[in-house]
From Swiss-Prot:
The electron transfer flavoprotein serves as a specific electron acceptor for several dehydrogenases, including five acyl-CoA dehydrogenases, glutaryl-CoA and sarcosine dehydrogenase. It transfers the electrons to the main mitochondrial respiratory chain via ETF-ubiquinone oxidoreductase (ETF dehydrogenase). Involved in leucine catabolism and in phytol degradation. Induction: Expressed constitutively. Not induced by dark treatment or sucrose starvation. Its cofactor is FAD; AMP. Keywords: Electron transport, FAD, Flavoprotein, Mitochondrion, Transit peptide, Transport. This is Electron transfer flavoprotein subunit beta, mitochondrial.
Length: 251
C-alpha cells in the first residue's frame, strides 16, 4: 500500500505575521518558512504505519513555489520515500488544492491519504474533506489515534469532537486528517538529512494534471485584527465590581 501525504510550506509558527502594505496577503519575503505543524503530524503517522509493515511507500506532496522543495526535503529527511512537487506561483484556495490532490491520487493509487487537519496560515480546515468528496472515499477528520486492520482493510480512527472522542471505522482507501494529539513528530537525523538529498522529487505542473483551477471565491482583502486596549490591574474585588458596574456597565 502507498500512503500519500500532503505537506504545506507556511510561515513558521514563531514568526510574527505581518500583512502586506497592499493588503493582498501576508508578508513571506525574508521570513522563516517551515512545514505546517499539522502536516508534520500527518507525515509522522504515515511513517509509523509504514514502519509497522502496513505500507510499502510514503509519498510527500507539496503544491506551491520552487521553495516548496525545501519542505519536501524535510519530509524526505524524516523518512518519506519520494516527493512530488506541483510547482505554481499562484495561491490556490482549498478546493483547487483538493482537485490537484485528487488528480495525484488517480495517478498514484494510494491506499491512504493523510493531511493535517488545517494549515496554520489560513486555518481553513477544508482540504481533506474536499479531497475525500472528490474521490468518493470515506474520511476521518481530527484524528487523535489511528489503528489499521490489514486483514479487514479497515482503519479505526479516534477523532476529537466537542466534549469527547468519536471512534470511526473507515474502509480503505480513505482520507484521514490529523490533530495535534495523534503523535509527536520525529526530528530528522543528520544521516537522514544527507540521504534526503539523493531521494527523488518529481516536478509537475497543474497543466500536467489537467486540473481546472478556476475558483468561484475571490479574496478581497487581508487585514490585521484591530488593536485592543490594554487591560487594567485592580487592587481589590470591590474595585473590580465598581469598574464593571460603573465603567463597563456589565453588572
Amino acid at each position: 500500500m502507498k500512503i500519500l501525504v500532503a505537506v504545506k510550506r507556511v510561515v513558521d509558527y514563531a514568526v510574527k505575521i505581518r500583512v502586506k502594505p497592499d493588503k493582498t496577503g501576508v508578508e513571506t519575503q525574508n521570513v522563516k518558512m517551515s512545514m505546517n505543524p499539522f502536516c508534520e503530524i500527518a507525515l509522522e503517522e504515515a511513517l509509523r504505519i509504514k514502519e509497522a509493515g502496513f505500507a510499502k511507500e510514503v509519498i510527500a506532496v507539496s503544491i506551491g513555489p520552487s521553495q516548496c522543495v525545501d519542505t519536501l526535503r524535510t519530509g524526505l529527511a524524516m523518512g518519506a520515500d519520494r516527493g512530488i512537487h506541483v510547482e505554481t506561483n499562484s495561491i490556490f484556495l482549498p478546493l483547487t488544492i483538493a482537485k490537484i490532490l485528487k488528480s495525484l491520487a488517480d495517478v498514484e493509487n494510494p491506499g491512504l491519504i493523510f493531511l493535517g487537519k488545517q494549515a496554520i496560515d489560513d486555518d481553513c480546515n477544508q482540504t481533506g474533506q474536499m479531497v475525500a468528496a472528490l474521490l468518493g472515499w470515506p474520511q476521518a477528520t481530527f484524528a487523535s489515534k489511528v489503528v489499521l486492520d490489514k486483514d479487514k482493510n479497515v482503519a479505526t480512527v479516534d477523532r476529537e469532537v466537542d466534549g469527547g472522542l468519536e471512534t470511526l471505522n473507515v474502509d480503505l482507501p480513505a482520507v484521514i486528517t490529523t490533530d495535534l494529539r495523534l503523535n509527536q513528530p520525529r526530528y530528522a537525523s543528520l544521516p537522514n538529512i544527507m540521504k534526503a538529498k539523493s531521494k527523488p522529487i518529481k516536478k509537475m505542473t497543474v497543466q500536467d494534471l489537467k486540473v481546472d483551477i478556476k475558483s468561484d471565491i475571490e479574496i478581497l482583502e487581508v487585514t490585521e485584527p484591530p488593536k485592543r486596549k490594554s487591560g487594567v490591574m485592580v487592587s481589590s474585588v470591590d474595585e473590580l465590581i465598581d469598574k464593571l458596574k460603573n465603567e463597563a456597565h456589565v453588572v
